[in-house]
């Protein structure tokens, strides 16, 4: 979570702390990039999607980020339509967000980021409130953005659904890198080793 907050600029903009080292996005020091520019490049899906909602209805929420880019209404409508088609969530259109299940809320949070077409996606514990079907759908969405050449950074304890998608798995313990694995190397770890690391 801390790393995702560093990459999206929430640290040090909104969360204080001592930072040692540098965080670079596209070769630029993150602390030198205005938040509006970071938001155009980096999309974040938080562990609890309710904390990132600004609207009551799903279509307005999906359009919120691109609306702030001052796109014409026709372009907004087209992008919302394209987003819901790409992510197969047409059935969630024009719904009250607060009547959705946890998994459906997560899909809307992801869709609102996807609509902005960022180069970098940050997801914080995205599977934590999802059932098996929703986790499979999340994996499909991640596969889609990976095919589009996007960079995806995920903070997660459940890794089983990511092992075929991940290029690299970085294991952190108390803020220190304890291991870097390819997907294949991670699959070779025993169940005992993964449990000892607190991973599933």
Question: Where does each model-flagged region fall?
Answer:
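Hydrophobic anchor residue at the start of the ABC signature
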Residues: 110
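Catalytic Walker B motif of ABC-type/P-loop ATPase nucleotide-binding domains
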Residues: 121-124
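Conserved ABC ATPase "signature" region
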Residues: 74-92
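Conserved ABC transporter NBD signature motif
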Residues: 16-28
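Conserved ABC ATPase signature
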Residues: 96-100, 104
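Conserved beta-strand-loop-alpha-helix hinge in the C-terminal portion
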Residues: 176-199
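H-loop/switch region of ABC-family ATPase nucleotide-binding domains
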Residues: 156-157
């Amino acid at each position: 979570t801390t790393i995702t907050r560093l990459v999206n600029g929430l640290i040090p903009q909104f969360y204080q702390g001592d930072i040692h080292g540098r965080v670079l996005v596209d070769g630029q020091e993150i602390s030198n990039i205005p938040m509006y520019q970071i938001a155009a490049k980096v999309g974040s899906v938080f562990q609890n999607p309710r904390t990132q909602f600004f609207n009551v209805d799903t279509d307005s929420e999906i359009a919120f980020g691109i609306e702030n880019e001052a796109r014409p209404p026709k372009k907004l409508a087209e992008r919302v339509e394209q987003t819901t088609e790409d992510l197969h969530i047409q059935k969630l259109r024009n719904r009250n967000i607060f009547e959705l299940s946890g998994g459906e809320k997560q899909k809307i949070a992801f869709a609102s980021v996807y609509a902005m077409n960022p180069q970098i996606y940050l997801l914080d514990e995205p599977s934590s409130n999802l059932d098996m079907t929703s986790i499979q759908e999340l994996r499909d969405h991640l596969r889609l953005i990976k095919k589009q050449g996007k960079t995806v950074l995920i903070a997660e304890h459940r890794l089983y659904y990511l092992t075929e998608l991940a290029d690299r798995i970085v294991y952190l313990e108390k803020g220190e890198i304890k291991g870097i694995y390819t997907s294949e190397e991670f699959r070779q770890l025993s169940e005992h080793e993964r449990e000892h690391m607190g991973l599933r």
